[in-house]
Amino acid sequence: TECMTLLKSLDMNAVRLRVWVNPTDGWCNAADLLVKARRASNLGMRIMIDFHYSDSWADPSKQTKPAAWTTYDLNGLKTAVANHTRDVLTLLKNNQIAVEWVQVGNETGNGMLWETGKASVSMSNYAALTTAGYDAVKEVYPNAKVIVHIHNGYDNNLFRWIFDGLKNNGGKWDIIGMSLYPSWYTVKNDWQSANNACLANMNDMVTRYNKEVMIVECGMSWDIAATAKSFLTDLISKTKQVKNGMGTGVFYWEPQSYGNWKGYTLGAFDNSGRPTVALDAFRNITETLQLKAETFNIHYNKTVAEISFDERFRKVSVISAAGKIVLTAENTDSIETRQLSPGTYIVNALAYSGKESKAKVLLY
């Protein structure tokens, strides 16, 4: 199955596509971006464009100027940012691609286009470059929302420093974007505390700047999929709890990366190239947030290889000890288990009332 088609089947409804200025291998340049954006558009997915303003990865540890821009002063960089942003978005618009959000910079917690746009060196330069990108976006897509994206969504001091700095220097933005990775939290993988701190930060950003907030990146190790699902389910729930309804979405970064792809272990596919149970957090999300886990009566009949229930459910899923969905059925009061090996399984049952129930069953 093609990647975007598969992710859409898992109830993901939006895609975030990065673009580099002049990458050496061509991946993530404007032409490559157009191919991916067309694919997403044809699937009816909502689209975010993520400008790195670099020839390769830009992140908190590096914000390297594109090779062609290295000699530019501030005014030259403002012009280059505006032209690059305008040119890429015009290409998409001319191909009838609807763009809903645009990031001007990627994880710019200390600015971008170092050293000129490094926030700790010159917040005013960083604000000017951000505004150059913002204005260029609005020229092409007046209704697109522009995102300034910062890492460590739990770090309120960092966010106040950056957005106070932008505000005081004439910076423009529509949405505050956050990354949240529990592996980077003060206590590694303490996702509950990370999520709590992130929600507090999101609410503070809404109060302080009256801007929407969005989780534009998150992830957790692929080999603790059940934990990752709990993290994501809670994060999605908390984002929907942001005051005044101003939490606008959650994106998983590179969910399709698997195992130890290029040294990255925070994807959500296993070593066989299949999505893990973590991504179930995105399924039917408006409904799932209101579900309540309870036990229910379950019966296993080895003779006919069947699990049966005392009521009919909208959907039933059987999950292995490894966290994989191994059986599903809809509108049913039983499910055949003939193809399953002996062992312990979790059965999730979604009632027509919208209530989710869980039970453990031993097949022998």
Model-assigned labels for residue ranges:
Residues V318-V326, Y345:
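Short, glycine-anchored, charge-dense loop/turn motifs used at functional sites
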Residues D204-R208, D223-D234, K238-F296:
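Aromatic-rich peripheral "rim/lid" segments of glycoside hydrolase catalytic domains that contact
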Residues L289-S317, S334-I335, Q339:
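Glycine-centered coil/turn sites that cap beta-strands in beta-rich domains
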Residues W20-N22, H52-S54, V104-G109, H149-Y154, ...:
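Active-site beta-loop-alpha junctions enriched in small/polar residues
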Residues E2-A58, S120-I147, Q192-M202, V206-R208:
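Aromatic-lined substrate-binding rim segments of carbohydrate-active enzymes
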Residues V15-L17, I47-F51, E100-V104, V146-V148, ...:
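Hydrophobic faces of well-ordered beta-strands that scaffold small-molecule active sites
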